């Protein structure tokens, strides 16, 4: 792989200038993750909340929903949009959204949540792990639904998490099958030796993912090395180290990387180091392939859960829901430049 990087340097520069020919495409779906709590609680989002979607509010009440989104990037934006669309379908004009973005700052999440609590909102959507943690700390009475977080047990420090948080919290998780992601990496890069695990140490969900996939990758014969950065300020230097010492880099569903994919792309592409991503937004920005969920659909599932809660269902008994299907996706121009042969069951991402 190291020798290949030099040979590919010229070809890869074309990726920076524009898109090359596609590698071929078709669709595939993968079953929900079979790790941790998801074994017992994974449900189809098509079935989840379907009854709520067919019910229309007739009591005339206007529901006020506070939305705390950690940061602005494609995945979280899509989850918020799906959530709002699902609730609007049920309640029409009788639901109002106070959508606020914390710009990646956990302390700002807490400030936003405190505002929702002061307003006595009817329900809070916490989009991403830091937002969920702030909401859990901010109120034990207002219903909280999380989304775009990976593992609620890790995020909320719950021992022996069984899939149901209890109290005033439930939601959806974006956990992809990490064993499937490892298998996908091996399918595309069977001759690679060293895998760099690039992630933000401040994001509990990212740490969980790299720890988990490391075990799967090592079983496939790879040597793995952690490359943790504390925030966007040291992403460039850490990513450079990873690119210098890795054959392939893996990035989980990391919010900091998702908001700074250009940094990763501008380092890894000239270095000739392909990036396998945990979700499609990161993949579009800097990756070659991903096994990803639809964040819009995840948001819709969360919105259907919210409708049930607002119509009287007990949130304390509602298990965390997971995406039922996952799609192998690839970026055609980068795969072409790297000379990657993409199997027919991958779907080309729009560039």
Segment roles from a protein language model:
Residues 21-37:
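Bacterial lipoprotein signal-peptidase II cleavage site
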Residues 55-61, 152-194, 293-313:
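Hydrophobic alpha-helical segments within soluble ligand-binding/sensing domains
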């Amino acid at each position: 792989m190291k020798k290949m990087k030099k040979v590919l340097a010229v070809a890869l520069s074309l990726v920076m200038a524009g898109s090359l020919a596609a590698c071929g495409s078709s669709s595939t779906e993968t079953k929900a993750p079979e790790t941790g709590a998801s074994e017992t609680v994974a449900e189809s989002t098509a079935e989840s909340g379907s009854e709520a979607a067919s019910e229309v509010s007739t009591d005339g009440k206007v529901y006020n929903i506070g939305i705390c989104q950690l940061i602005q990037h494609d995945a979280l934006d899509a989850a918020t949009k799906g959530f709002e669309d699902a609730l609007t379908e049920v309640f029409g004009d009788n639901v109002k959204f106070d959508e606020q973005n914390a710009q990646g700052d956990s302390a700002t999440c807490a400030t936003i949540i405190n505002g929702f609590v002061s307003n006595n909102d009817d329900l809070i959507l916490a989009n991403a792990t830091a937002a969920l943690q702030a909401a859990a700390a901010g109120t034990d009475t207002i219903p909280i639904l999380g989304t775009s977080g990976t593992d609620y047990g890790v995020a909320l420090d719950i021992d022996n998490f069984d899939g149901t948080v209890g109290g005033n919290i439930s939601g959806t998780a974006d956990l992809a099958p990490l064993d499937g992601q490892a298998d996908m990496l091996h399918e595309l890069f069977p001759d690679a030796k060293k895998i760099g695990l690039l992630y933000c140490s401040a994001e509990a969900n990212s740490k969980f993912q790299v720890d988990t996939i490391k075990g799967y990758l090592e079983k496939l014969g790879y040597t793995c090395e952690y490359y943790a950065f504390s925030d966007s300020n040291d992403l460039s230097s850490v990513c450079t180290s990873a690119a210098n010492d890795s054959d392939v880099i893996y990035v989980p569903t990391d919010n900091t990387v998702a908001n700074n994919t250009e940094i990763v792309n501008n380092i890894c592409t000239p270095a000739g180091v392909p990036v396998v991503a945990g979700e499609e937004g990161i993949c579009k920005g800097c990756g070659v392939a991903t096994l990803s969920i639809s964040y819009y659909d995840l948001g819709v599932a969360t919105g259907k859960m919210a409708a049930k809660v607002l119509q009287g269902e007990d949130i304390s008994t509602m298990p965390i829901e997971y995406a039922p299907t996952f799609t192998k996706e690839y970026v055609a121009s980068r795969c072409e430049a790297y000379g990657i042969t993409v199997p027919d069951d991958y779907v080309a991402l729009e560039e």
